[in-house]
């Protein structure tokens, strides 16, 4: 987001929509399939440089309000930029048919005043430091179960369902396998 290496932030985000909404077990919220757990935050009235790549297949980073659609290709880094003048939430999505999860790849950018951005940045740096400090930690079974449930709910339940029974044959049941 800037030229100061001390202020660099790297993170990923995942779809926030719970599997219960996807499988019509509960009512869908207003931004169904459009919310993420970790939105990109940028300051307004500054030129923001986006570096775009992929770890797996070709994707496309598309945010219509920024007039940006750039391919994300493994092994390549593409760049784009935008100047956002109004605070607000800007939504986009993957615009390249990239596989079975294509419909579950929203992009959320929150544009804020500079002071709010600085607060967000400090918070992200503190989160990164806290994660780094857990590298050698001895985790209790209870702590590991809590972390595992968070990951399963966020990542796995979309295919394997909240109850672990999956959608055979494409997504096998995890019940009784020792994996869940």
PLM regions: where:
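Non-transmembrane, membrane-proximal soluble domains of secreted or membrane proteins
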Residues: 1-147
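Gly/Gly-Pro-rich "capping" loops immediately C-terminal to redox-active cysteine motifs
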Residues: 83, 106-113, 166-180
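Cys/His/Pro-rich metal-binding microdomains
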Residues: 95, 157, 172
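Sequence/structural segment immediately N-terminal to covalent heme-attachment motifs in c-type
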Residues: 141-167, 175-180
């Amino acid at each position: 987001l800037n030229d100061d290496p001390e202020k660099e932030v790297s993170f990923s985000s995942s779809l926030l929509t719970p599997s219960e909404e996807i499988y019509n077990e509960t009512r869908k919220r207003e931004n169904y399939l459009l919310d993420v757990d970790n939105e990109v935050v940028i300051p307004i009235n500054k030129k923001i440089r986006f570096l775009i790549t992929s770890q797996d297949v070709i994707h496309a980073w598309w945010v219509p309000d920024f007039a940006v659609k750039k391919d994300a290709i493994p092994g390549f880094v593409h760049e784009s930029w935008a100047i956002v003048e109004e605070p607000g939430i800007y939504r986009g999505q993957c615009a390249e048919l990239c596989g079975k999860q294509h419909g579950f790849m929203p992009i959320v950018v929150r544009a804020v005043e500079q002071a709010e951005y600085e607060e967000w940045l400090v918070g992200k740096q503190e989160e990164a430091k806290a994660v780094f400090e857990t590298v050698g930690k001895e985790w209790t079974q209870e702590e590991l179960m809590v972390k595992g449930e968070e990951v399963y709910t966020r990542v796995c339940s979309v295919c394997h369902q909240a109850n672990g029974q999956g959608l055979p044959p494409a997504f096998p049941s995890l019940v009784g396998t020792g994996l869940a």
